[in-house]
Design a protein with these regions (language model features):
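Conserved beta-strand/loop scaffold segments within soluble protein domains that form the structured core
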Residues: 2-254, 268, 272-293
Length: 293
């Protein structure tokens, strides 16, 4: 059962669930889309995404529009044995929205899950992603991108629970902040349990503070109960806009506004190019450009 308070409220409060079932051995050419928009009142929502054994698919969960109160959401993702699933969660709300999303990820034996979180909109957005390895040999990639404007609070919490042997995980989140009282929080927890021989894991969070008055909190945590692992590490870095990079570009005739865009685009591009869903990549680059306009 969920332990986070908002997760408990969402778990107990939903009236019906939306289920996306990908049959075993199916390979879907086009992404499956789930659109959540214009929420009215305080709502608890429950979504389930299940990928059958040996299936391959991409699911895009898009949040956009306005809300008069708040959305408290549970998203369950399950990959069957040897499945290959990509889940993209886009948060592009209007500036008035409160959104808490608790995303629970379960990986079967030898399966691959790529979990991508993109947060640009909302007044307060809090997304927690918890991972449970249910069989050996599973591979997890978690990518996160967020852009925080003045007055926004965007919070991302990750928990990777390595309880099975020979599993692999990589967690990389990057964020940029601009404007007074822009605030981001990233907390990354990784636990390697005693039974998880051969674990290979690494988590990274980087933040780029573009203006005065913005604040980024970053807390990576790693707990190891097993000495027989392939590797484990974590890193966090938060820095201000690099004036030397800006000067270098401007000294070669690049206008200041364009130079700033180039630096920020370069900061995000490495991560965006790993997403592997062309329509999402193009959309994100355009959104970053709009944030900097």
């Amino acid at each position: 059962a969920p332990g986070d308070r908002t997760a408990v409220v969402a778990w107990n409060g939903f009236e019906q669930a939306t289920v996306v079932e990908i049959p075993a051995e199916a390979e879907l050419d086009a992404p499956v889309r789930i659109n959540v928009a214009n929420v009215e009142g305080t709502r608890a929502q429950h979504l389930m995404i299940r990928a059958g054994a040996f299936s391959k698919a991409t699911v895009i969960l898009s949040h956009a529009g306005s809300a008069q109160a708040a959305l408290n959401q549970t998203v369950e993702v399950e990959t069957g044995d040897s499945a290959n699933l990509t889940v993209v969660s886009l948060q592009e709300w209007d500036d008035t929205v409160l959104h808490a999303s608790n995303q629970r990820l379960a990986l079967g034996r030898d399966s691959k899950l790529t979990h991508i979180v993109v947060t640009f909109g909302g007044d307060l957005v809090r997304l927690c992603a918890d991972t449970d390895f249910r069989g050996p040999g599973a591979e997890l990639t978690m990518l996160g991108i967020y852009f925080v404007d003045g007055g926004q609070h965007l919070e991302h919490r990750v928990f990777v629970d390595h309880s099975q042997p020979k599993c692999f995980s990589r967690v990389t989140y990057k964020g940029a902040l601009q404007g007074k009282d822009a605030h981001s929080v990233w907390i990354g927890d990784c636990l390697i349990r005693e039974a998880a021989d051969g674990t290979d894991t690494y988590e990274l969070n980087r933040n780029l503070v573009l203006t005065e008055g913005a604040k980024a909190d970053s807390v990576p945590n790693l707990e190891i109960e097993n000495g027989e692992i392939e590797g484990a590490g974590h890193a966090s870095a938060t820095g201000r806009f690099d004036d030397e990079q800006l000067f270098y570009l401007m000294s070669r005739g690049v206008p200041e506004a364009e130079a700033r865009r180039l630096v920020v685009r370069g900061f995000f591009a490495e991560l965006i190019n790993q997403i592997g869903v062309p329509e999402v990549v193009d959309h994100l680059m355009a959104t970053v450009e709009a944030e900097l306009a």
